């Protein structure tokens, strides 16, 4: 029996977390997004934006936000974290 295959629409935090959760259960997931990079909405926010919740409450399942990003994670660091999340979980992407 071959593993199930799922397409997840959106390479933002929700889509990436869904793909990681599926992968943890042995389900192959492909994340598709019309933009060319993960976390595209975060990339468009203003430069000085920080998360409004502390780092320890803001991570996605299976990979906490690293301490090096500080307690109040900046916009650029959220983007970097999402990219690390993809690599950590080996999430398959089809972007653009």
What are these regions (language model features)?
Residues 3-31:
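N-terminal Rossmann-like FAD-binding beta1-loop-alpha1 element of flavoenzymes
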Residues 23, 56, 87:
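Short polybasic/polar patches that bind polyanions
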Residues 87-96:
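A conserved beta-strand/loop element that lines the FAD pocket in flavoprotein oxidoreductases
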Residues 9-12, 34, 61, 95:
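A secondary-structure boundary/capping signal
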Residues 40-81:
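Glycine-rich active-site loop/strand segments that organize a redox cofactor
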Residues 36-38:
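Helix N-cap at the beta1-alpha1 junction of Rossmann-like dinucleotide-binding domains, i.e.
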């Amino acid at each position: 029996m071959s593993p199930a295959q799922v397409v997840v629409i959106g390479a933002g935090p929700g889509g990436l977390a869904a793909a990681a959760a599926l992968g943890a259960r042995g389900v192959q997931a492909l994340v598709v997004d019309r933009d060319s990079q993960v976390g595209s909405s975060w990339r468009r926010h203003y430069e000085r934006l920080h998360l409004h919740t502390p780092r320890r409450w803001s991570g996605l399942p299976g990979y906490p936000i690293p301490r090096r990003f500080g307690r109040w994670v900046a916009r650029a660091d959220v983007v970097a974290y999402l990219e690390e999340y993809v690599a950590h979980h080996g999430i398959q992407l089809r972007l653009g």
